[in-house]
Amino acid sequence: MAKKENRIVITLACTECGDRNYTTTKNRKNDTNRLELMKYCPRLRKRTLHRETK
């Protein structure tokens, strides 16, 4: 039996417009909370808060 992977692929969605602009990986063991990063939103043309989505 293979062990369950710790690193998973997640998508980051803009909190202002709702677009899913970025994908990244996170370690399931070290980062149990939802990831929040300030990233550039091409639709709004400014830096906004992006949150992890399911």
UniProtKB/Swiss-Prot annotation:
GO molecular function: structural constituent of ribosome
Cellular component, GO annotation: cytoplasm; ribonucleoprotein complex; ribosome
Xref: Pfam families: Ribosomal_L33 (PF00471)
Sections of the chain in a coiled coil: none
Signal peptide range: none
Ribosomal protein listed as a keyword: yes
The keyword Hydrolase belongs to this UniProt entry's keyword annotation: no
GO biological process: translation
Gene3D superfamilies for this protein: Ribosomal protein L33
Keyword annotations from UniProtKB, A to Z: Ribonucleoprotein, Ribosomal protein
Family: Belongs to the bacterial ribosomal protein bL33 family.
Identification of the protein by name: Large ribosomal subunit protein bL33
Organism: Herpetosiphon aurantiacus (strain ATCC 23779 / DSM 785 / 114-95)
Gene from which the chain derives: rpmG
